[in-house]
Amino acid sequence: MRLLLIHSDHIEYEARKKTKVAEEDAVQKDALDEALAVFCAVESVDEENIEDAVRQAADEIVATARQLGTTNIMIYPYAHLSSDLASPGAAVSVLKGIEGALVGTDGFVVKRAPFGWYKAFSLSCKGHPLSELSRTILPGEGAAAPKKEIEHEFFVITPEGDRKNAADYAKEETPFAALIRKELGYPGPEGAEPVHVDLMRAKELVEYEPRADVGNHRWMPRGKLIRDLLSDYVLTQVLDYGGMPVETPVMYDLGDAAIAEHAAKFGERQYRFKSGNRDMMLRFAACFGMFSIMHDMHISPNTLPMKLYELSTYSFRHEQKGEVIGLKRLRAFTMPDMHTLCRDMDGALTAFEEQLAIGWKTGEDLETPLVGVFRCTRDFFEQYELWVKGIVAKSGVPMLIEVLSERTHYWIAKVDLAAIDAQGRPIENPTVQIDVESADRFDIKYYAPDGTEVHPPILHCSPTGSIERVICAMLEGTAAQEVPSFPTWLAPTQVRLVPVAERHICFAEEIDTRLNAAGIRADVDDRDESVNKKIREAGMDWVPYVAVIGDQEAETGRLMVTIRKLSEKKKPFKESMTESELVQAVKLETAGKPFRPLYTPRLLSRKPRFI
């Protein structure tokens, strides 16, 4: 930040014409006598630590004013002091921050000329040796500002409503205990690479893209099928719940004050770039686009709660290179994102319960057992303690509770549900949050019957968490399975037909055609390989149902089927079935779940290797 400080007899300004980034509701004309005029250019470097830039600038202004013996301050945005300016939104945040810090100083009279206006001004400089000073502010170079300590209190609430010491649970060897150990800061497991990293490649699902930025992946047909089915699944859940799908851009202009302020909440882990002379960012969630839609809508309280949903493909977070790993932490990911505009806090609490129930259900449907932590401010807990106990009771399992002494984010309450990986580390997936800032920030409002303007609470909900983390959790969960498998509805191949000899291939193809027509993903291993090798490779592909086709099967029409989920290690479970019984068995397992056809050739002889 660049400051030009002029001790003046008099300064006055008049705002004449708006620019496209002009502050609204600005004071159009003002003046001060015996004042320190502070001409200020907020620079791009200030965006790295706005809080520190504000603190240092305010300290410099206060020190200079006291040295000059004045308590009147005029803050004047003056872009001409620098050629490397911050985004307009960040600049406004800094200027408001400086104003707020100075207003809180005893005896000071503070005025601020508006940002983003063409202004006329007149200034009378006193002309003494200290009347013209310049300062350069670099965030992080001054003495560290004392940070207000946020207190965190942890405890467990049981479904019966009892409050328990969280540390007592940490001694157990359970998924819930693993979550508690992580939240309480216990030393975690180190060194071992997550199980899913090898599996995601071995199963030809997904792998790193070496020609892209780290944390950006390429998806093979088998992985793409699973990813698409999961997306279909979430869409079905959202539509059943009354959500309305939308689609919004992946990039946003940081010159918009609301965008810049919301982006600043997430710190430096953002992809930012220049588009001409505009500072842009890639979204890290679908909030920006949905809030923009809500801002432009005419909202009637009779339409609330209103739920908008987007499968955010892609969202971007510039995670530290050393933290990027597999499908757990990426820089580009797919986030199912629903935002619910509620009428009031009672409506938000009701919707929160409903969406939490959806989150628990996704863990069951995806066969990824979940554990939960509920976080809120102390004020919220004191007001809604009975409600918190109620959602734990409805969940039917104990939950870790974290109570914060003050609000530090846009939410006052949130729940995070997590699967536990093979090393005992949480994989946070579904979440629901009560946002009490964004409606104000983006001017999302409705009018009550008495004409009162209302900026209502907004729920953020990802019913599953990112699609990549869901697959991560499923793969990690297989480490505890004696015979690892995908849920049948997600298996890239649901039935594999293994002809014993070349003469059986035509019969196998006929069955394969009928199975696919019945809505079952089936393929035929027609390669010139031994039956044992074909069966072994079907096992490596985690195919749920494998049927060997020989002379007897061709004659009788009955198939000897190996059922993976009922098998034990080195002890396959086999059952004789008719073709219709096989169809019925698969349909029973996949009932109510989305279906997509094979993404790979039906004949394995025509299937390429990707990895």
From Swiss-Prot:
Zn(2+) binds at residues 287, 339, 460. Its cofactor is Zn(2+). CDD domains: ThrRS_anticodon. Keywords: Aminoacyl-tRNA synthetase, ATP-binding, Cytoplasm, Ligase, Metal-binding, Nucleotide-binding, Protein biosynthesis, RNA-binding, tRNA-binding, Zinc. One of its GO terms (molecular function) is tRNA binding. GO terms for biological process: threonyl-tRNA aminoacylation. Residues 1-145 are annotated as: Editing domain. GO terms for cellular component: cytoplasm. Binds 1 zinc ion per subunit. It is an enzyme of class 6 (ligase). It catalyses: tRNA(Thr) + L-threonine + ATP = L-threonyl-tRNA(Thr) + AMP + diphosphate + H(+). It comes from the Archaea. Pfam families: HGTP_anticodon, tRNA-synt_2b, tRNA-Thr_ED. Its EC number is 6.1.1.3. Residues 195-487 are annotated as: Catalytic. It is found in: Cytoplasm. Catalyzes the attachment of threonine to tRNA(Thr) in a two-step reaction: L-threonine is first activated by ATP to form Thr-AMP and then transferred to the acceptor end of tRNA(Thr). Also edits incorrectly charged L-seryl-tRNA(Thr). The N-terminal domain is an archaea-specific tRNA-editing domain that hydrolyzes incorrectly charged L-seryl-tRNA(Thr). Catalysis of tRNA editing is performed by the charged tRNA itself. Homodimer. Belongs to the class-II aminoacyl-tRNA synthetase family. This is Threonine--tRNA ligase. It comes from Methanoculleus marisnigri (strain ATCC 35101 / DSM 1498 / JR1). The lineage of its organism: Archaea, Methanobacteriati, Methanobacteriota, Stenosarchaea group, Methanomicrobia.
